[in-house]
């Protein structure tokens, strides 16, 4: 539904638009900064989608490349241990 002023009604949870963190800080995703990259990984070690991170498409692609490079350099794990594996 579009109103006369051209705005759209927000549906679902939250009404605030996420801002691309890298663009806001004026930096690029870097594979040598694993602490910053870990924030974009889920609990199982998978890369979070754009709708969860709020990154632009361009920065999401650069983030993916940086995470994959960090994984190959052994700075980040490929997968996180699951809860059942931790008991052993």
UniProtKB/Swiss-Prot annotation:
<dbReference type="Pfam" id="PF01084">
    <property type="entry name" value="Ribosomal_S18"/>
</dbReference>
<dbReference type="GO" id="GO:0006412">
    <property type="term" value="P:translation"/>
</dbReference>
<keyword id="KW-0687">Ribonucleoprotein</keyword>
<dbReference type="GO" id="GO:0070181">
    <property type="term" value="F:small ribosomal subunit rRNA binding"/>
</dbReference>
<keyword id="KW-0694">RNA-binding</keyword>
<dbReference type="GO" id="GO:0022627">
    <property type="term" value="C:cytosolic small ribosomal subunit"/>
</dbReference>
<comment type="function">
    <text>Binds as a heterodimer with protein bS6 to the central domain of the 16S rRNA, where it helps stabilize the platform of the 30S subunit.</text>
</comment>
<comment type="similarity">
    <text>Belongs to the bacterial ribosomal protein bS18 family.</text>
</comment>
<keyword id="KW-0699">rRNA-binding</keyword>
<dbReference type="InterPro" id="IPR001648">
    <property type="entry name" value="Ribosomal_bS18"/>
</dbReference>
<dbReference type="InterPro" id="IPR036870">
    <property type="entry name" value="Ribosomal_bS18_sf"/>
</dbReference>
<dbReference type="InterPro" id="IPR018275">
    <property type="entry name" value="Ribosomal_bS18_CS"/>
</dbReference>
<comment type="subunit">
    <text>Part of the 30S ribosomal subunit. Forms a tight heterodimer with protein bS6.</text>
</comment>
<dbReference type="GO" id="GO:0003735">
    <property type="term" value="F:structural constituent of ribosome"/>
</dbReference>
<protein>
    <recommendedName>
        <fullName>Small ribosomal subunit protein bS18A</fullName>
    </recommendedName>
</protein>
<keyword id="KW-0689">Ribosomal protein</keyword>
């Amino acid at each position: 539904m579009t109103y006369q002023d051209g705005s759209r009604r927000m549906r679902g949870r939250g009404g605030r638009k996420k801002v691309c963190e890298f663009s806001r800080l004026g930096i690029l995703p870097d594979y040598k900064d694993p602490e910053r990259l870990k924030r974009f990984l889920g609990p199982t070690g998978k890369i979070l989608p754009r709708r969860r991170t709020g990154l632009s498409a361009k920065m999401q692609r650069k983030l993916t490349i940086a995470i994959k490079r960090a994984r190959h350099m052994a700075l980040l794990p490929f997968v996180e241990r699951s809860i059942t594996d931790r008991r052993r």
